[in-house]
């Protein structure tokens, strides 16, 4: 037996350089000797003076031992300690009388200290090696092996972990002993237990170790046993708090340890003490690790031990006053986690009912936190509560109103999470019990009306019953009073009988009252239920209006969430969802993806597929096709021009993805063909109510609109329905329904493929002749219906697309329409007769045709030019290939003979052809001897310049349009007629004419830039036209011209800037978009800022607040410091020359709002108006 002093050995080990320990000559032999000794009994560790020292030397030399010897040594010590612990525990538990084992305690103590020291030495060396390995390798705990070095490190890590597990297992056996019986004083016991806990806390600093589940389990169990059974709560608390402050990866570990302590060892005190300490801790402003680690810990603890955390929540909540956003976020998230965990069990929820209510209230308060991340955590906490099966109906109602309010938050993160919360609230709404899950407001209002009327009728019935009861009782009393005293016996008997009768009546009344009370209560509850539902639906309606505006957010994730919400709202049959879904249609033009790579347009297709291309499972193929066709038609009904353009793009994409099949197209054609049948029924039997109910006019229009859109993606669709188009749309039905005729013309035009040329024919000559004849007829047809003009425009477009000789046909058209308008009939039944019709209407139609033919001729000539260039390139390429291949003369002759046209092109100079086309446009179309268009120039000028004489509004509109289109043909005519058009744009009382004049001037700016550029001031004036439509038209026109580079931006940007504060939201939004786009073009805002500022500052009609609002917006685009500095210098120069207080104030406002600051400028501004007065 040797004298072993634990403190001495421990101090020596901690202060000695570990590399200085002597190497053993033959460690294997010495280890085998010790193994033999300890095999007899673990108490043989110090049987001889040399055995203990030999074992200690082996442990000190542990790093230099072979892997095999290391494993043997660690196993020997761990197994010996385990066996010793078992023996001691057995003796302590079996011997009740302490005096019997009192003599053994000093020996046990010495042996435990010896083994404890050896364990600590091994733990220290192992944790050093693990730390070294983990710092060298990146592949620990992973299957991938990037190199041989990593592979060796992984193997070493696993071996060390296995040895560590053996040692830790022996420690758990040791800690099962009641050490207080062996170590008489607390310092002795603490020193002994510290042999194990200190190395373990150092070991925990190695992150890969905490990912080995078996090691983590042993460490947590050891620490828990030390706390519970051996009074180490204070020291372990201190170590845990240190770890929490410096090591992020230990947040989850510590939370799991505290859960183990609470669940298996029934020791929640440590958790509570740690939470108390956290709540009072003050963090350094520069410290980011500490708050983050504490936050992760609180969040994990709230998930694992919500009950314990709830008890200390009053202290934890104080962290909400902390400046650290991370800590505030964690507290808010913890609140949500606690409620979510506790509310899963009904009994627990009932027990913590009040505390849960307080936490929910806290979450609601945090919706108004100053930081968006904290607000987001509050929203996410509410989302977790909404996922629960427990009913929080009152809370959900509050969540709904808060979420709707948060949709207007400045942070896109908050808005996106608000949309998610609303989706959950809608998905799990509590109003499904009686009338199903649908939430159509009109239906619920009807339910409420029904219940209220039922309640009123029930109340009246109850009142009438009460009155009857009072009457019966009163009559009985009166009869008793009037009884004669002489008839006492009879009276008593009668009284008895009457009392019995009265008792029976009272019982019936009580039953009736009980029934009435139950009915009344039920009705009142129903009314409350309906009112709550209606309130919820109205909140959802508000949210839809706001979410519809989020569809065009710059944040792609927000857009996708908004789309999904609108689809969900439609599934619940909420009326207003249609508004959002229609608005969603315009996202088809949006490019880009979200963080996960989801394309906006692809997601839009998925949404519309779910909404409109998915039929009930119970339907057969024909029914599904009909369902989809009707849905598509409904999309077109009531749609604006912008809606139809977006729908056309979307349907094209859907068709390309084969989401719309031939069955649907067949149904659409069937609906379109029903127009003929409906027309015949109407003519034959107008009042026959028994006739089969057909499709409405809107549905028939919708069918051909959709078919026209699909034909753009696949021209075969229109080609296959050509006969129907000619017989119905361009036949008798179309003549009576010009809208149907218009869209039929559009579909007819689209049977020509998009990539076709003017030479390629889409249909054979016979079908072309029929189609052209029909188009010709509907164009010259006289009607007073104003739908004629859009129909005529489409018909002429189709004519120029389909016909192989559109110029000749157009000439004939104009001649015949002219004869119809001005000519005299040769016969009474002549087709040209206009006996009962207005020549003014006919003239309006004629001028419209002339103008449209002028533009279409111009387009036709440009197509000819483009086709010439294309075929010339093809000819040159072909000839070059023939020469290179050395083809024989015979083949070359045959090729050239087969394509004489190409030969002609090959011999023509490209510039000559372009000049010829330009000559035709400039001189022949309007000024040629045989020019039919030129004949109308004087007529149009006369009508436009004499509006008092030709006062018909439609005639004036068509004449102005015609003038504009003729001006686009020739720069000569444009220059001549430009003053007339500007006069009309300035002075016409008709806003439609002024709008058309603005558009015409825009077109001319593209065609003849040099002519219009000098007169753009007149165009900019219309930005402040008294009519809103003219303002919008002008803003769109100028926006296009500037962004496309068609006009030079001079001093007119100031006029554009004034539109930023326009009362009309649409105009101000459009103007914002313009400046946003302009800012991306070569510092355009910076270059034009001084001119804009001068314009705004000198405008006395512009309010002070409006000026500030506009300037603030524009300054956001000047973000380069160099530009800010230069602008600052320019404005300071102006500041010194100011003559009025207003000028000085305006410049000072800009300088104060510029991010660039200068001390001289600040001093100058502080002097204020003194500078001005000195000048004066």
UniProtKB/Swiss-Prot annotation:
Annotated Gene Ontology cellular component terms: condensed chromosome, centromeric region; condensin complex; nucleolus
General function of this protein: Regulatory subunit of the condensin complex, a complex required for conversion of interphase chromatin into mitotic-like condense chromosomes. The condensin complex probably introduces positive supercoils into relaxed DNA in the presence of type I topoisomerases and converts nicked DNA into positive knotted forms in the presence of type II topoisomerases. The condensin complex probably also plays a role during interphase.
GO biological process: cell division; chromosome condensation; maintenance of rDNA; meiotic chromosome condensation; meiotic chromosome separation; mitotic chromosome condensation; mitotic sister chromatid segregation; negative regulation of meiotic DNA double-strand break formation
Key words, A-Z: Cell cycle, Cell division, Chromosome, DNA condensation, Mitosis, Nucleus, Phosphoprotein, Repeat
Localization in the cell: Nucleus; Chromosome
Family as reported in the entry's similarity comment: Belongs to the CND1 (condensin subunit 1) family.
GO molecular-function terms, A-Z: histone binding
Coiled coil segments of this chain: none
Superkingdom in the source lineage: Eukaryota
Assembly and binders: Component of the condensin complex, which contains the SMC2 and SMC4 heterodimer, and three non SMC subunits that probably regulate the complex: BRN1, YCS4 and YCG1/YCS5.
Name used for this protein in its record: Condensin complex subunit 1
InterPro entries in alphabetical order: ARM-like, ARM-type_fold, CND1/NCAPD3, Cnd1_C, Condensin_cplx_su1, Condensin_cplx_su1_N
Miscellaneous comment text of the record: Present with 2540 molecules/cell in log phase SD medium.
UniProt keyword Lyase present: no
Record PTM Phosphoserine, positions in chain: 464, 475
KW Transmembrane (keyword) present: no
